Swiss-Prot record:
Gene Ontology CC terms, in alphabetical order: chloroplast thylakoid membrane; respiratory chain complex I
This protein's record includes keyword GTP-binding: no
Its EC number(s): 7.1.1.-
Cofactors demanded by this protein: [4Fe-4S] cluster
Disulphide connectivity of cysteines: none
Molecular function GO terms recorded: 4 iron, 4 sulfur cluster binding; iron ion binding; NADH dehydrogenase (ubiquinone) activity; quinone binding
Annotated family: Belongs to the complex I 20 kDa subunit family.
Pfam family, one: Oxidored_q6
Protein name: NAD(P)H-quinone oxidoreductase subunit K, chloroplastic
Subunit structure: NDH is composed of at least 16 different subunits, 5 of which are encoded in the nucleus.
Organism (species): Nicotiana tomentosiformis
Length: 225
């Protein structure tokens, strides 16, 4: 364009055109409209409820809480996760569309907290079930800390590359009742192998030779009589 023939158009065009990349535009739109799925099970979730008030006003970050995982791209776990709740949490995470993010809020969610000491029914860290993007320690964390975690997640989203999101395929991590871990690729059907989740401890810990020898010795007539 000849700036001599159109001087006014040249001056206004410089203030109206924004040059950016498709990746940056996608990141900007996602970090400005995070829709969280609130997974609160304990007292830490009460601190997150304080963000809804006018003092902190979490609406300025574009957060819109959703009740369905299919409409959410962020799951915020707060509180203790038990072994019976582990399959439900994994199922909720798998139902969320990509890209999706996780914020672990509170000591009980991150490490199991005081409930994980000599406990057979508490998951020792939610990162053993689903991948966590931001850890938020505290018992419970303050609302200011929750805002700081959301800010850090927004910075992480702004630096993401589309190629890296396509290349990274996350797998399901199954947590058994014996605190053993199994990795299996996602099939996106919502169905899970209950035999893997609830396998009996005696068949997996006792060797085969000793197990059958023990059965034969108990069922022998000499020991029964």
């Amino acid at each position: 364009m000849n700036s001599i023939q159109f001087p006014l158009l040249d001056r206004t065009a410089q203030n109206s055109v924004i040059s950016t990349t498709l990746n940056d535009l996608s990141n900007w739109s996602r970090l400005s409209s995070l829709w969280p799925l609130l997974y609160g099970t304990s007292c830490c979730f009460i601190e997150f409820a304080s963000l809804i008030g006018s003092r902190f006003d979490f609406d300025r970050y574009g957060l819109v809480p959703r009740s369905s995982p299919r409409q959410a791209d962020l799951i915020l776990t707060a509180g203790t996760v038990t072994m019976k709740m582990a399959p439900s949490l994994v199922r909720l995470y798998e139902q969320m569309p990509e890209p999706k993010y996780v914020i672990a809020m509170g000591a009980c969610t991150i490490t199991g907290g005081m409930f994980s000491t000599d406990s057979y029914s508490t998951v020792r860290g939610v990162d053993k079930l689903i991948p966590v993007d931001v850890y938020l320690p505290g018992c419970p964390p303050k609302p200011e800390a929750v805002i700081d975690a959301i800010t850090k997640l927004r910075k992480k989203i702004s630096r993401e590359l589309y190629e890296d999101r396509i290349r990274s395929q996350r797998a399901n991590r199954y947590f058994t009742t014996n605190h053993k871990f199994h990795v299996q690729h996602s099939i996106h059907t919502g169905n899970y192998d209950q035999r893997v989740l609830y396998q009996p401890p005696f068949t997996s810990e006792i060797p085969t030779e000793i197990f059958f020898k023990y059965k034969n010795s108990v069922s022998s007539p000499e020991l029964v009589n």
